Every structure is written in C-alpha cells, then in structure tokens.
C-alpha cells in the first residue's frame, strides 16, 4: 500500500515492566498478544488528545519483551444492577451503596520488560500527529489494562520523517507486518486478525462491532527484501490501517 514517498509521523518509544495485551474472549486464563493491538494504540492516542470521535490513522507496531509469566489473581466483579441477582448472598459495601458481587480465581499472562517502538500518523491531519507528540510528554501514557502505565523514552520519542527505501539491517524488533507484505518478503510468523477500531455504541448492553486488519507477527532478526518505509534512524516502519479510510 503506497502513501507517497515520505510523511511525518510520531515515533513513540515506550517501556513497560509488566503488561498484558489481552486477547479478546480469553477468560479464566487471560492470554496476551505479543504486542499491543492497533485498537489499543488507537484508543490511547484518541484518549491523550481528548478526541470524542474516531479519526483515521496509520500505526506501525514493533517491540521486544524478555519473558512471560503467569500470575494467579483473585477477581471480583460487581453487578451494575444488584436486582439482577436477587439470590446472590455475596454483598459488598462500595462507598455509600451495597453491591452484589461474584469472585473467582483467574490466571493472567504478563509480558516482562517490554520495549515498544510505535509509529503513529493521523491520515490527512498532520496537526493531530504533532499534538499527540506534545501530549505524550505532558500526560500519563497507559497501554493495555487500565493500570498498565508506560514510561516514555523522552530521548528517542520524536516527530520523524519516513521514506521509502531498503533497510540494510535485519529487524531489531519483532513486529506486526501486513499479511501481503510478509508474503512478498517470504517471511513466516504467527498470523493474526487484529482489532483496529469498533463502531460507536450507546451503552454497555450493546456489543462492540470491530473492524479487523490481517497481519503477521514476525520475529526480530528477519531480513526485509522488498522496499519499505524507513525512519530517520533506519528503523523499518510497517503501517497497519483500515482500507478506504480518509
């Protein structure tokens, strides 16, 4: 997919000591993607900019982690409407109200010492990209669960120009690469259909209808033979985006 010979993007470098990028519909054993999904990053970017509606963007996701562990946690879930479980004897006082609740044991995958290299560009709106660059220096960045705070590397995070070219080096980080590009480069990996964004919902009772992007999780040290976008520090950039968005 060709966007032009060059463009300005935000390169956001993050570190998380322990994080879970939850795979949807994993319960009991909460599994994690190896890298955050486009939907998580889209939500993070829109939240940092206080955007109340969706604006199209391109996202490149790469990173490494040292290891993975499984934590055992006790999970408590409170009913939004206590009347929905009239026979539930488990009552918990929350503030000034009493809630019915359920509790159970859950196993959660956690990635350890995760370093992320994200390239983000709003489509046809360079001003939003520049504003996002300002906000990551001023606000707390959260990616993954609500308590998965990320540390921003202020020295490596910057606005950068990406251009079409060939990287002479192998991949330094594992990355999500569009399926067609992975096939052209004859690179194998784990195939994912990742959530990118969901259609607006009115309340918690409505199901989120997601739009997905097909990609391959490619391990570091692979060589990219085809022409690729490269940033100013010679890092390859593989944009994920939804088709027909402007």
Enumerate the predicted regions with their spans.
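Extracellular structured ligand-interaction cores
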Residues: 7, 56-58, 113-115
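Short, structured patches in soluble enzyme cores that scaffold and shape functional sites
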Residues: 14-16, 63, 120-122
